[in-house]
Amino acid sequence: MALMVTLGVMLLRLPVGWGIQQLLPNPQGDPALYYAALILQEMLLWGLPALLMLPFRSRRLVVQRKWLGVSTAAVFIGTMTQMAMMAVTPLWVELTGAGQGEIMLPRNEIQWVLAVLALVVVPALVEEAFFRGGLLTGLCDTMGALPALLLSTLVFALMHGSLAGFPAHLAISLLCGLGMLTRGRLRVPVVMHMCYNGAALLLRNTPASWMPALPLGVILTAAAMWMCAQILWRGRYRQLKAADTAMLCVIVLGAAAMYIPELI
């Protein structure tokens, strides 16, 4: 079910974006409409499809009841990831020549509220519900925890359709997936993702040279290795059915095809 829903979202991603542009008059010229369009797109692409994948359960997820320390760690990891990737992304853009999209900034208090909802809160909630709650947990029982983590991470990054942001999407997706697998609750990746997005908004004018990429990278790598060690025991790789394998290949190749215009 998770793969079928993901395939449907991959096929509808571009038509939904086009439809929203036709529905809302010139969202690029008005910050309020721009944020409303982003919220609507997030809800249609990720929020509603995530409901089709309920309940978000897997036999391989061990639910941890402690929440305060875990939430604090999620805040730290999400914020540090954004800071590290702010230093890495310009190097990646220079290497690949990828174009970076501009985010429209708010001009008043009401627009700031809409901006926080559109850029921080809503994406964290609906994307984590879809990718970690639905896709990751759905794949865990069919192919094992570690392969499910790696594939859901790749699909998350590809489905965002941004070559410039590809390394950053890979990094936060991997860490959110590890958080879900090690703690068993959607709250952990949601908090991590929300802090990652929030740091991007708050630090948007901070020079990349100010970001200590190397020490932050060491910290994040150590955290990722520690979480990986916890999930390795959850089961070996289980071979997918032929139909599921074909569907997964179509999803990955179809999502990757969105990058062709930037690469040629």
Where do the protein language model's features map onto the residues?
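Short, Lys/Arg-rich N-terminal segment immediately upstream of the first membrane anchor
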Residues: 1, 64-65, 237-241
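Membrane-interfacial loop-to-transmembrane alpha-helix junctions, especially the N-terminal start
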Residues: 1-4, 185-186
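Alpha-helical transmembrane segments of MFS and MFS-like solute carriers/permeases
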Residues: 4-8, 73-77, 81, 118-119, ...
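Alpha-helical transmembrane segments in multi-pass membrane proteins
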Residues: 5-55, 69, 73-76, 210-219
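Hydrophobic core of alpha-helical transmembrane segments in multi-pass integral membrane proteins
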Residues: 6-14, 45-52, 78-90, 216-232, ...
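Alpha-helical membrane-inserting segments
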Residues: 12-20, 24, 48-56, 81-92, ...
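Juxtamembrane helix-loop-helix connectors linking adjacent transmembrane helices
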Residues: 22-37, 58-129, 136-141, 256-264
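Transmembrane helix-loop-helix hairpins at the membrane interface
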Residues: 113-263
